[in-house]
Amino acid sequence: MKEKRDLKIQAIENGTVIDHIKAGQALNVLRILGISSAFRATISFVMNAPGAAGIKDVVKIEGKELSVEELNRIALISPKATINIIRDFKVVQKNKVVLPSYVEGVVRCINPNCISNSSEPIKSKFSVLQSEEEGVTLNCLYCEHVISENIAENLL
């Protein structure tokens, strides 16, 4: 007899649940959101959990509703993620992340000669494109360098 296995993460009273994160990307989602050990709210996450659509990660952030801008940056590494806003243990809002057309100060340009990598106080700026064949592609607005792989490795 096949045993049923459920994904068990404690429910949160108020906060944000980020579901359907690309497998193995939960820690990078936390990096994108600027969440570190100094963050004082409760964070729960599961990596490589089985789901109906395959393997996924899930992140729960207690007591904090993230801004639309924060959430949409997640689309850089997990364009199919969904966001659930929780109040009194109930989902009151559910949205898919939206890939922004532009990001600033989120990703490091891979071109070592780019002005954003110099000692000048200039934040990196990228236009963001998505295609079925290539996935997410970032184009540096300063040097026109393209990042289409390993975006997570270049997060600031």
UniProtKB/Swiss-Prot annotation:
Cofactor: binding comment: Binds 1 zinc ion per subunit.
SUPFAM superfamilies: Aspartate carbamoyltransferase, Regulatory-chain, C-terminal domain, Aspartate carbamoyltransferase, Regulatory-chain, N-terminal domain
A Pfam family reported for this protein in Swiss-Prot or TrEMBL: PyrI
Cofactors that this protein relies on: Zn(2+)
Alphabetic keyword roster: Metal-binding, Pyrimidine biosynthesis, Zinc
GO cellular component, one term: aspartate carbamoyltransferase complex
S-S pairs: none
Signal sequence interval, chain numbering: none
GO molecular function, one term: metal ion binding
Single GO biological process annotation from the record: 'de novo' pyrimidine nucleobase biosynthetic process
NCBIfam families: ATCase_reg (TIGR00240)
Family: Belongs to the PyrI family.
Assembly mode: Contains catalytic and regulatory chains.
PANTHER family for the chain: ASPARTATE CARBAMOYLTRANSFERASE REGULATORY CHAIN (PTHR35805:SF1)
Protein name per Swiss-Prot or TrEMBL: Aspartate carbamoyltransferase regulatory chain
Organism: Methanosarcina barkeri (strain Fusaro / DSM 804)
